[in-house]
Amino acid sequence: MEFQKGMDLSFIPELEDAGVQVKDFDGTIMDPLDLVQKYGVNSVRLRIWNAPEHVRESGGYCSYAHTLAMAKRIRAHGMSFMLDFHYSDFWADPGQQRKPKDWENLSFKELKEAVFSYTRDTLTALKEEDVLPDIVQIGNEIRSGLLFPDGELPDYTKMVQLVNAGIRGARAAAGKDEMQVMIHLDQGGRYFYLKEWFDGSFAAGLEDFDLIGLSYYPFWHGTFTDLKETMTKLIWDYKKPIMVVETAHAWRKSVHGFIDEQQEKIAGFPATPVGQKQVLDLVANVVASMPDEMGQGLYYWEPICVPKDGEGGWSENMGLLDEKGTVLDGVLSFLFTPVSYTHLTLPTKLE
């Protein structure tokens, strides 16, 4: 597989509906996909929610219809496409894996059947539109399980049955077409957390998959050395290619406290455009340093967001656009040419 230099661009339909414009360094207004492709991005990740219309805060975005429209734009640009099933009507992450409203009253057997059918049918529909994903995630950051409470850890047996249902649904839809199945966990720099999950899951009968995907945010998930060692050990243990499918760093200090000064120190790089680019360069090089080209890419999580006055959260300082919608230097990291840095030396963190 070509080294994936990717971004999660799931917010684009919502931002475009709100009239947000993105600009190149010289102020030229550009289509977001044209802009990121210009600077080396060759893959786009999208999340899909089952029925976001059930959750007012979702705005109805990340539906199948939005996914299909975005997938067609991605393919028109000749880029690869990763689809991230959340198996929820809204956000799913280690702290919340809420079942879709339509699945709340299903028996466990019915829930497994729903996961299989929904995965198969969604991917089959995309395949019929000639936009079958290149990679599909069975759940989002499922280190604590998925579809709570049924698939919540420490019950590996039930969780694995649900994950297997998703894997089977994906395989059934793909048929003879090439589509890789990914398992995605957070805590990318915490080897023992991840080893515990994989060992427990395989012992419970986890079926074969193709890729390991990690979330790695340097202010939350360990040092860059931790990331390198974790990825290397996971490759040794499980013989699977690996990607960092979520990463990011701040380009300015947070007024509203999303990333505070202590977290900035933990990350080891300043919350500046230069610091943001340094982090991305380093993550890319760590992934490329994996043996036998088993490090296969990285994705920035939601870079296309424009901060608004008085608004906190991710858009305040974590995207790759400034308050005018102009692209920041971090995007230049995606012009990266992967080389196998077998003896990569990592920098000392800031004190």
Describe each PLM feature range:
Residues 22-36, 119-122, 191-201, 283:
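Short, acidic/polar
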